[in-house]
Amino acid sequence: MGPLSRDAWAQRLGAFRASPSAFMAGPEGEDLGRDLLSDLRSEKLSEQTKVSLLALSMEYPAQLWPDASAAEVAATSLLDTLVLLPPRPSALRRPLLLAATTALAAGGALGPTSGASCRLLPLLLGLAAGSDLGRGFVPASEQRPLQATACECLRELESCKPGLLGGSLGLLRGLLGQEGPVQPLSLLLALALRNTLVLQSRVGAGLGGLLTDKVSPTGGGPWDWTLVEEGDGRLQPQAPSWPAAEEGEGERSLTAREHSPEEARELRAAVIQLLDTSYLLTPVAQAQLLWLLGWALRGLQGQPPALFKPQLVRLLGTAQLTLLHAMLALKAAFGEALFTAQDEALLLRRLTLAAQHPALPPPTHLFYLHCVLSFPENWPLGPEGEEAAPLLLGPQLCRGLLPSLLHDPMALLARLHLLCLLCAEEEEEEKGQLPSPRHYLEELLAGLRQRAALDGGPRALATLCFQASYLVACCLAGQPTVLTPLIHGLAQLYQARPMLAPHFVDLLDQVDSELREPLKVVLRQVVVSRPGRDEALCWHLQMLAKVADGDAQSATLNFLQAAAAHCTNWDLQQGLLRVCRALLRAGVRGGLVDLLQVLARQLEDPDGRDHARLYYILLAHLAAPKLGVALGPSLAAPALASSLVAENQGFVAALMVQEAPALVRLSLGSHRVKGPLPVLKLQPEALEPIYSLELRFRVEGQLYAPLEAVHVPCLCPGRPARPLLLPLQPRCPAPARLDVHALYTTSTGLTCHAHLPPLFVNFADLFLPFPQPPEGAGLGFFEELWDSCLPEGAESRVWCPLGPQGLEGLVSRHLEPFVVVAQPPTSYCVAIHLPPDSKLLLRLEAALADGVPVALRTDDWAVLPLAGDYLRGLAAAV
């Protein structure tokens, strides 16, 4: 089939982008990558269409090249297309370089044994160096763009394989001083330098002459794959993340590293060279460069952080957020070794003033507030109980950062966090100056509670109030002077608006005991002081179920007895029973017995009466420890026919599909060789009774068509199950791995899913016999098949070892269904049909004591290595 037209490709790409997985599983998915590579060389397609094809290959490399071999083939084809381009300017050179790099990196094919890698790496290094590659390969008008693109490609490969460019440091350093794209070269050199320093420290080696050696980009290659293997592809993080600058790398990269005086001098010169040209870079690139160099030099002996001082002076007044973030990352990395006290005070003042600018958009405003909050000197550095470092952030400095009810919620919470930092300081406030931070905090919280208490007020106001209360409780947990008014204020809020009970329950679940226990006492007092016929009875019962315990038993029971007469619907009755359950677990007995007897007789709902009767029986027959165990969370799944599920497990868990250990085992049975398709015979075995079992199978790659699920109504342990038949639809005759997923229902009614061990389809599992020829025509039939394989097919000869069973035993055990002509015990002709449309023919003749020569013919050359491995392994197969 010839190349597709532009419209046909547009339609095909549109269908692919709409659903890549569905397209690749369809009939056109298998040929998409091959057609794309082929049509890139077609003269009928415009360059614009080819660029769109290359863009697709860069966006979806995993779908187009699913494994390393496919990625290797794709990269080789892309490089061939690049070489075949005419010497005139073309819009395809840069996309082809990027596409080849993406294919190798994403497909996992980059390595010393990859032919495409050995072609691409010298090409990229030569382009980055601006070398003359001959044959007018790089037109003059494309010199700088291609040089920049080559640097970007090398940076991507260095990121995938850290240490790859360790031998090119001297060359890259020399290129930085020449005319060329400064930004790509700077970032490439910084990344390669960072990776090399970290990896060399792991093996205890120095830089040697790496920073001074000028290797030839077209020579044998400066690639150090041993250093790449040491890196193992896991040098993270690649982006600024402070204050834990090296959290992802671990302690090994933080160990002090010392170089020889000559190495230290060359390293210092390289870093200074990069820093001196950093002002030519964009703000984002400058930030990345500073981060890479900061991480590289942190922990290096003989490399003072003062190298960054000129950049620090330049950046202290920057308005670029990315550069400010990079500067704070340097502060987190080097601390006082780079920043003086004056620098820290100036930087903090700069942050606080910038955060007060009225024209800042909300994200920028929150960023400045986050920087102020994360400023290292704003946090106590000593352990609890010891004197901590004083805060640089004082009331005078952050006067304009105090929170107000007029701020939006996120800004208010961030400013409230700052206010909590001020309140945590125990320094006395000077009279006549600002009001006390704690007094301001109490007024702010009172205002938030007042807004949350408004009847009909928006839910967001109540949510903000509880978020602020939680933040204060976390920051000031050890200060009773703050927590006491907070507790009483929250109690007044509940008294004014009981419908906020769910918020209180959530707050009690989240806070520590310093706030939780006294708040529970106050809330219980508020609830039991209300009349039992209150219109907010449902909220009171919900709150009481959370705060009820063994204290104040009489007041709680009196409230419940008064409320029982007003619990006329199912919701209220269930709420009342939940409070009784909480009292049972708390060890309350006494008057609870009488209350449960009354409820067992008077409740209208039969389910409620059953609950009350059950609680009464448990209370009468179990001691307190056993009662707590009986009413506690159960590890066993309860029966689903009762609403008791809502108490022990919840309806949500009963209705959701839960992940669970596999309760079914799956094994492969004997191979079935009948029918038009190969069929796997599966033998299931259940560990527990399961129902409505559905087995789903997924084949890695595009080797087979999607497999249908297999359904089993019931499986029980100890009871033999019927074998399951799984038809296979191979798209090519090759072994495969089947991932198995089980979905089933347990005897308790829960729906669970589990991943089973994978199943492996062997080459022999695909064998099918040809139709049996008429009697006496077997030899002619086989010879006709034998001759039809050539010249398009392939043939080979293999030595097949024989075990003690001899040739006749080997054939009868493994190949008997496929024998067309037999002259036992010395000669056999075997014809095997391999779906979808291939054949494998074997002649086994002149057997010796230890083996037999086998002549093979097939119309599919890819079958030969599989057939050879299969025949050589027959003797070992028992």
From Swiss-Prot:
Compositionally biased spans, kind Basic and acidic residues: 250-260
Listed name of the protein: AP-5 complex subunit beta-1
Pfam family, one: AP5B1_N
GO BP annotation list: endosomal transport; protein transport; vesicle-mediated transport
The species this protein was found in: Homo sapiens
Function (record text): As part of AP-5, a probable fifth adaptor protein complex it may be involved in endosomal transport.
InterPro entries, per database record: AP5B1, AP5B1_barrel, AP5B1_C, AP5B1_middle, AP5B1_N
Record text on subunit structure and interactions: Probably part of the adaptor protein complex 5 (AP-5), a tetramer composed of AP5B1, AP5M1, AP5S1 and AP5Z1. Interacts with ZFYVE26 and SPG11.
Signal peptide stretch: none
Gene Ontology CC terms, in alphabetical order: AP-5 adaptor complex; AP-type membrane coat adaptor complex; late endosome; lysosomal membrane
Keywords: Protein transport, Transport
Segments for region (Disordered): 234-260
